[in-house]
């Protein structure tokens, strides 16, 4: 594996890469609060299997550029960055894989540019269609009220200074975040995504939160160093563009994912509390869905918690394209 700096039309991207330069291209899109290194096991496995694997630090993260304006983090920018990355390699096709926030990016790559992204695989977050009644933050508030679990964290993240709590103690914030969504964390200590009154995404996590079993100190130090240097404003600006995304994607209302697709989620992933309802209808929205897996015992950080199973899932999907 190697770390590259690739200049695209919109920005300079830091990319973890492996595999023959002429191998079939696979782009891996991380989520929050992660980096391209969250795909290290997959980049290695794909490279060894003959694929050209690229895992960028996404816009606003790590070694990739961080625009200042909130409105520069829309889904159109994020998909555009992946289009530019593919083009920078002299390619006209790629498979896109996404996890967490990277899953909606991957789904929208396939939705908006099926000519370029010939297949899509997503982890943790199923495709969620645009709901005409939006905007999303209002629907999320209604969901919070209906479930009675407290305020939804994405609504809390809309605050212009929400990132400051993370930046005040980067190591502590990351430790709590990884712990709260990990499959090994006891049920009564894992997050639901909804915060009791008077708490935040971070303060609701127990103070004695530890690193997940799969997260070594050296690996954790990489995250801490990257987010200490970059801050988390850009990362949270992704969330602050959710309503703007809803406005910008009106032209894609009711459009389906037509390329081959695959989806995997851990059965202990807290995202299922608020997005799991979309798993049942995934085949209707992605008619060429070829594999849908619920991985027993796995939490949210599935490609790092259970790398061997995720590698087998991806390689199996790719081999049948």
Regions found by a protein language model. Give the residues of each.
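Active-site helix-initiating loop/hinge in glycosyltransferases
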Residues: 31, 74, 305-306
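Short, hydrophobic alpha-helix immediately C-terminal to the catalytic nucleophile
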Residues: 40, 107-111, 311
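Catalytic active-site module of serine/aspartate enzymes centered on a nucleophile-bearing elbow/loop
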Residues: 289-321
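Conserved HGGG/HGGXW glycine-rich cap/lid loop of the alpha/beta-hydrolase fold
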Residues: 17-65
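Glycine-rich phosphate-binding loop signature in dinucleotide/nucleotide-binding domains
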Residues: 20-21, 89-92, 321
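Signature tryptophan residues that serve as conserved aromatic anchors
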Residues: 32, 36-39, 101, 107, ...
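A short loop-to-beta-strand scaffold at the N-terminal edge of the catalytic core in hydrolase folds
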Residues: 9-17
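Flexible "cap/lid" subdomain of the alpha/beta-hydrolase fold that forms the substrate-access gate
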Residues: 1-2, 12-13, 25, 61-97, ...
């Amino acid at each position: 594996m190697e770390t590259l700096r690739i200049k695209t039309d919109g920005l300079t991207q830091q990319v973890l890469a492996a595999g023959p330069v002429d191998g079939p291209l696979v782009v891996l899109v991380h989520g929050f609060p992660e980096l391209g290194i969250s795909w290290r096991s997959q980049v290695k496995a794909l490279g060894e299997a003959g694929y050209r694997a690229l895992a960028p630090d996404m816009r606003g993260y790590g070694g990739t550029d961080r625009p200042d304006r909130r409105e520069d983090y829309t889904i159109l920018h994020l998909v555009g960055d992946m289009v530019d990355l593919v083009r920078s390699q002299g390619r006209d096709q790629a498979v896109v894989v996404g996890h967490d926030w990277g899953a909606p990016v991957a789904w929208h790559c396939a939705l908006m540019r099926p000519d370029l992204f010939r297949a899509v695989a997503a982890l943790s977050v199923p495709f969620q269609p645009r709901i005409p009644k939006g905007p999303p933050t209002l629907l999320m508030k209604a969901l919070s009220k209906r479930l009675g679990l407290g305020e939804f964290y994405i609504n809390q993240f809309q605050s212009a200074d929400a990132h400051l709590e993370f930046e005040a103690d980067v190591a502590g914030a990351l430790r709590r975040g990884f712990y709260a969504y990990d499959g090994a964390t006891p049920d009564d200590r894992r997050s639901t995504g909804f915060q009791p009154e008077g708490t935040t995404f971070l303060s609701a996590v127990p103070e004695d939160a530890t690193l997940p079993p799969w997260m070594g100190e050296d690996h954790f130090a990489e995250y801490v160093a990257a987010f200490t240097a970059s801050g988390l404003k850009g990362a949270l600006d992704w969330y602050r563009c959710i309503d703007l995304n809803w406005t910008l994607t009106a032209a894609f209302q009711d459009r389906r994912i037509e390329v081959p697709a695959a989806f995997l989620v851990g059965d202990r992933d807290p995202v299922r509390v608020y997005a799991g309802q979309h798993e049942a209808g995934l085949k209707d929205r992605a008619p060429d869905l070829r594999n849908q897996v619920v991985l027993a015992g796995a939490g949210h950080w599935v490609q790092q918690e259970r790398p061997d199973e995720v590698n087998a899932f991806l390689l199996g999907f790719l081999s049948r394209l």
